[in-house]
Structure formats: C-alpha cells, structure tokens
C-alpha cells in the first residue's frame, strides 16, 4: 500500500486517537498527545460525515472534560487546529478552549 505523507499523518493521528479512546474508556487520564489526537479525530471524522465548520468547532469542545486529562493538560491546550477534508474541499478548523 502506497501512502503519501499526508495520508500517513492521518493514519498516525487516527491510531493515536483509537489508543486515547481506549484509555479514556478504561478511566485512564489522557496526556497531551492523546488529548490532541482524540479531539482532532473527532473533527476529521465529523468533516467526513458532512458536518459544517461551525458544528465541528462546537463538537470539538464536547470530546473531553478536565477530569479526562492529566493535571495541567487542560491549561496547556488553548486551541486545536485541524486541516479536515469536507465534501467541498479541505478547510482549517480551529477548536478554541477544547477541554472544559
């Protein structure tokens, strides 16, 4: 299987998000990369499902709570930017204050 660098990045992100999802389900608090991956994957999958940028900006804020991440992680993540593929092209989605 031949993948270009962008496809490899998406696959790596998705794999990290799956790991984060499993850890969260077990009650393990997520670290910085896991939190970013889980929020990013939610945005990317939502774009693929046809949601709008505005819907995804809000959906990205619903993924994690402060209780889901290690101490200090919520304070470190002020925004998450994801380049997502929509039916009408690629757009940059910014989720502000994603962990509430």
From Swiss-Prot:
GO biological process: urea catabolic process
Keyword annotations: Cytoplasm, Hydrolase
Uppermost EC category: hydrolase
Enzyme Commission number(s) of this protein: 3.5.1.5
InterPro entries in the record: Urease_gamma (IPR012010), Urease_gamma/gamma-beta_su (IPR002026), Urease_gamma_sf (IPR036463), Urease_subunit (IPR050069)
UniProt keyword annotation of Nucleus present: no
Recorded coiled-coil stretches: none
SUPFAM superfamilies hit by this protein: Urease, gamma-subunit
Pfam families from the UniProt entry: Urease_gamma
Catalytic activity: urea + 2 H2O + H(+) = hydrogencarbonate + 2 NH4(+)
GO molecular function: nickel cation binding; urease activity
Localisation: Cytoplasm
Functional pathway: Nitrogen metabolism; urea degradation; CO(2) and NH(3) from urea (urease route): step 1/1
GO CC field: cytoplasm
PANTHER family per the UniProt record, alphabetical: UREASE
Summary of subunit composition and partner proteins: Heterotrimer of UreA (gamma), UreB (beta) and UreC (alpha) subunits. Three heterotrimers associate to form the active enzyme.
HAMAP family assigned: Urease_gamma
Family of the protein in this entry: Belongs to the urease gamma subunit family.
Annotated protein name in UniProt: Urease subunit gamma
Record lineage: Bacteria, Pseudomonadati, Pseudomonadota, Gammaproteobacteria, Cellvibrionales
């Amino acid at each position: 299987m031949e993948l270009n660098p962008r496809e490899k990045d998406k696959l790596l992100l998705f794999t990290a998000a799956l790991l984060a999802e499993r850890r969260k389900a077990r009650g393990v608090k997520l670290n910085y990369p896991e939190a970013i991956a889980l929020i990013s994957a939610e945005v990317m999958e939502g774009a693929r499902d046809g949601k709008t940028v505005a819907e995804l900006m809000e959906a990205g804020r619903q993924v994690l709570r402060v209780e889901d991440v290690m101490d200090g992680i919520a304070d470190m993540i002020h925004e998450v930017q994801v380049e997502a593929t929509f039916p009408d092209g690629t757009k940059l989605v910014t989720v502000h204050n994603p962990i509430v």
